[in-house]
Amino acid sequence: SVADLIQSPDYWSVMDYGQYMYDGYAPIGYSAYERSLMGWIKLYEPQEPGYISISPFDKATNNPKAVLLRNDENPAEYYILENRQPSTWFPSLMGNGMLVTHIDYVTSKWQYNTVNNDPNRQGYQIVPADNNKSPYNDEGKFSFECFKGDLFPGTYNMTELTDDTSPSTNVYAGNKLGKPIYDIKEEEGIITFCYKDPSLVGINFV
């Protein structure tokens, strides 16, 4: 069915099921995309290969709060990388790590609330690290444990996201995004990775 093909943000976004977290008494916190639309944060768009660190939203550091990887063939299509750590609005039962969102902004879809109506070209979707888009376990029961597998490196220790990995940074416009990330790590609540240059893997950055 179409419902089986469409992958909504589910509990990851307050614009979807996230508003019902804890029966609506503690809805999920705003995503990096939502926070950027509110003007609360600025999405960092790297211009050169290098080593990048992402801090959680509630930590005051010089690191960016979220990273944007734009499709050069279509500036309105991009990936957003953010650091999800347990806090007031992000429950520990959903895990911790880097959440990846694929945005394909088409004005009319946002205007008429049809963002994800087309299963072949969804406008707002989570890229699950375990490549499993279902919140249901092997027994067919809904489980918040399934959400932990969405995060990088997460429960499956997924340390890369490129045009060729599974999941991958596929794009609707053009052939490839061409902006791979390697050596994704999480240490003391900080997400780090090497952007575009695999030769940086293993180098100790301070």
What are these regions (language model features)?
Residues 16, 82, 204:
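Residue-level detector of conserved, well-ordered beta-strand and adjacent loop positions
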Residues 1-37:
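The catalytic-center signature of Zn2+-dependent metalloproteases
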Residues 198-206:
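Residue-level detector of functionally pivotal "anchor" positions at catalytic/ligand-binding pockets or at interdomain
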